[in-house]
Amino acid sequence: MRKLVEATQAGSEASVALAPSAPIQRLQAGLHHDPFEVLGVHVQPDGSKLVRAFLPAAEAVEVAGVRMTRVPGTDCFERLLPPGTALEAHPLLTWQDKRSGAWQRLRSPYSFAPQLGEMDLYLFGEGRHFEIWKVLGARVKTVDGVTGCLFAVWAPAVLRVSVVGDFNDWDGRRHPMRCRGVSGVWELFIPGLEAGHAYKYEILGRHGERVTKTDPYARQMFLRPETTSRVPDERPYAWGDAEWLAARTRFDWQHRPMSVYEVHPGSWRRRADGSFYSWRELTAELIPYVRDLGYTHIELLPVAEHPFDASWGYQVSGYYAATARFGSPDDLRAFVDACHQAGLGVLLDWVPGHFPKDDFALARFTGEPLYEHADPRRGEHQDWGTLVFDFGRNEVRNFLVANALYWLEEFHIDGLRVDAVASMLYLDYSRRHGEWLPNQHGGRENLEAIHFLHEVNAEVHARFPGAITIAEESTAWPAVSRPIELGGLGFSMKWNMGWMNDTLDYIEKEPVYRKYQHNQLTFSQMYAWSENFVLPLSHDEVVHLKKSLLDKMPGDRWQRFANLRLLYAWQYAHPGKKLLFMGGEFGQWNEWREAGQLDWVLLGFPEHDGIRALLRDLNRLYRDEAALHFWDFDPRGFRWIDCHDADQSVLSLVREGPDGAPPIVVLLNFTPVPRHGYRIGVPRAGAWCEVLNSDSMYYGGSNLGNGKPLYPAAVPWMGFGQSIEVTLPPLGAIFLKPCP
C-alpha cells in the first residue's frame, strides 16, 4: 500500500489525492496482471475501507454518497472511508459521463470473489471437463443477489486479458480479468451486463503483443462481416421431442433403414431477394419435403459460425456458436425439434481437424500458437491454408471433445459426421518429404489425434445412447467403424469413398466401354464387410468443375436420365446406408452453387420430377423391405447371382433379410440394349413380382419391364435349383420380390 500524501480532512470521510503508484500506473497503461490488487474495496488494518475504480469515461465518481478523488494523471478514482462506514459488499458507484454529463450507476466487478470452482479448473487442465461450455465463455447469472455476466477464457502465459465490448468502448483497460493461476483461465463477473451485448477478449501476450479475439466458447455471434461474440440468452428452450429421444436410446441403427438427405441450409432455397431462409422457414418447407421423399435423416453441412460463405461452413471460427445466418440458436433448436416430431433424425457435419487463420479467432490466440501445434510441420495444412489443432494438449482436446457433446446436448443432434478424418490420422497427409514430423516411434500415424478420436467416440456413445458418429475417411485405415476395445477408432460408420469413386468413374463411361471396367462395380464386395459403410453421393461430387450427377452421365438426354436412375437404383441395391446431396433428387443440371438456390424450376419438367418420384419409391422400398437394410453391414444380407456378365454389363444379386423376411432380387442393365429372356437363378420357388423398375413411365422411362408374375422353371442356374427369364429394360434396374 502506497503512502498517503494528504491527511484526513475534517468529517467522517477521507479524501486521498496521491501521486500514482506503480500498480496504478500499470493499470492506466493496461499492463497490470492482477487488477483485484488495485481495484475494488480494500479493508485497511485500522478497519477503514479504500475504494478504487478505474473509469476512463467518468468526469466524477461517488461512493456511499461521497465524492471520490481522481488519482492525478490517471483515470483511477479512490476514496478512503473511515472505520464503521456502512458499505455494501458490492458497493454501488455513481459516475458522471464526460461526454453527455449524465449520471449513471454501476457496481464494480472487483468486489466479487472468484466464481469458477477449483474442480472445474482441475478437470479442464486434465482434459476431462466434458461440459466445459458451462464454465468458460459468457454466461448471464446472479451472484450475491446481483445479476450480471461471468466471462471466462483460457489464455495461459500472458500478461493480461480483458473483456472489451460495446459496454466499455472496447477499452482493454476497463475490465481486466482475474487470472486463476496455473490453469491459464481468466475470469471476470461484470454486474448489470445482460444478454445481447457484443464482446471480445483483448490479450496482452507475454512478449508485449496485443491481440483482440472472439470468444472460443461463445455460444452466439453476430452476423458476418461482424466478428464479435454476443452474450447469449440463458432462457431455456422448451423441447417437445422427449418421445424421440427416448426412442433413440433403443435405436438399432445397424439393422434399421437409414437414408440421408444432405443439405446446405444456405442454398437449399432462398427468398426472392436472394437472402437466406431462416431456420423457421426451413422448418416449414424443408422438413415436409424431406419427409415426403422418405428419407430418414437430414444431414446439415456445418452450422457453427464461420466468416466465409464459400467455405460452406468447413472453416469454423466459432465452434460453440450456431451461425447467425439463419437465426438464433433457439431457431436451430426449433428446427431440430420439428424434425424429431416429424420422425426425422438430424446429423451435423463437424470439423475438428483444422481451423482457419483469421486473426480474430483461434489462430495465434495469445499472440503465439495455442490451439494449433507450434511447429508448422504439424500445425498447418498447406493445401487448405488452415491450421491443425494440437491434439496432444489437454485443454485443446477438451475444447473439441466437449464441443462434440455440446451439439448433442444443447441442440439434440442425433449424430456427427466427422470431416477430413484422414488428414487427422496421418502426420504426412498431403506433405512432401521433410515437411512432416514422425511420431515418437518414428511412424506417420498421429497418435494424439487417434487418442482424441477414441475419446470423442467413447464419450458420444456413452453419454448419448443411440447417437451415431460417421467418419469421412478416404484411406484404407483399418477398423474405423469398429469398437475401440477391438482396436478400432470407435466410429459407428464410415463413408465408402471407394464405392463412390469406382461407381461414378464407371457410370461416366459410354456404355460400349463399360464391359472393360466391370470390376469397378464388383470390387466393392471385396471389402464391403470390413466397415459399417455409408454410400455417399455428397456435395463434394458436384462442385469444382466435377459437374452435377446428371451432367456426369453419358449419352443423349434420354440416356442421361436413364443412367442417373440406374445409379440411384445401384446405390439402393448395394449394402450400406444411403446419402444424397440436395439437388440430386431431381437431377439438377448445374453444379451446386452455395451463393444461390437449387434450380427448383426443373421440377416442372417430367424427367426431373420422375427422378424425384424414383427416389421417393426407392426410399419406401428400402424402408419397407428388411432384405434391403437389415444386413447392410453383414455378409448374410448379400449374394451375387451373377457378377461375371461383363460382356452384357449386367449385374444380378439377391438381398436377404432376417428369418421370415422375403428376399429381394435385383438386376441392373448398364447398357442401352434391352435384354429379353434373360435367365437368372432365384433363391425361391414360386412366382416373382416386379416391385420397382427404374424404366417405369412414372419415372420418365420407356416402360419396358415385367408386368406379370414370373414363374420359375426347374432349370438349375447359377447355383440355384430354379430360374426365371426376365426382361431387362435399357439402362435400367428391376427389383423382384416373391409374389404375395
From Swiss-Prot:
GO cellular component: cytosol
Keywords from the named record: Carbohydrate metabolism, Glycogen biosynthesis, Glycogen metabolism, Glycosyltransferase, Transferase
GO BP terms: glycogen biosynthetic process
Keyword Ribonucleoprotein: no
Entry-linked CDD domains: AmyAc_Glg_BE, E_set_GBE_prok_N
Enzyme class: transferase
Organism domain of life: Bacteria
Pathway(s) annotated for this protein in UniProt: Glycan biosynthesis; glycogen biosynthesis
Quaternary structure and interacting proteins, as annotated: Monomer.
Family the entry assigns: Belongs to the glycosyl hydrolase 13 family. GlgB subfamily.
NCBIfam families the record matches: branching_enzym, PRK05402.1, PRK12313.1
Protein's UniProt name: 1,4-alpha-glucan branching enzyme GlgB
Species annotation: Thiobacillus denitrificans (strain ATCC 25259 / T1)
